[in-house]
Amino acid sequence: EAIASKAQAVAYILAANPAVKLACPVEELVDLYWQEAKRENVRPDLALAQSLVETGAYRYGGDVLHHQNNFCGLGTIGGGVRGASFATPQLGVRAHIQHLLAYTQTKRPSTVIVDPRYDLAHNIRLERGVVNTWYGLNGTWAMGSLYCEKIMATYQKILAQQPVEPEIKPATAESVKEKNKKKRSMKQRVSEILQEKK
């Protein structure tokens, strides 16, 4: 279950990179992480934090291009190899969650496999032992011993966000007058309709 809220996640993403490169609105991507991760009992806030680490807060700039909807570097090995591409952001998020499951679960995902590297990663993990904490991704998902620390640092920044509240404009005398005028107009129209029916 997520600890960070969706609103905090959106606020952090927009603060970290106001010019995100995504094929959908930020809010939609966050919703997709919550839907896809919850279905598979994965923490959506941590999966999203991993995605932010992998994509440079959706700046990309590495081997993967934003239109690939590849939010976790699936299939990239450096040297310009683009990695996997997905038709929609939802499929990209689903592939990310499935790839996490390949590392952490012995059972298969509940949805049709869209992660092209699922079987390879899953078979290796079954042979060597599944990862049972996020820190187990160090040196397995990505090279280096501080990979998970980057994910956790990003997650802490998400938690520190104040959700962006919609702007509420104070009522002015003019706006109240306009509202009352509309009410009177509506009452008058209803009255006219009732008169017509008599």
Specify the residue positions occupied by each region the protein language model found.
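Catalytic cores of secreted/periplasmic lytic hydrolases that degrade extracellular macromolecules
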Residues: 1-198
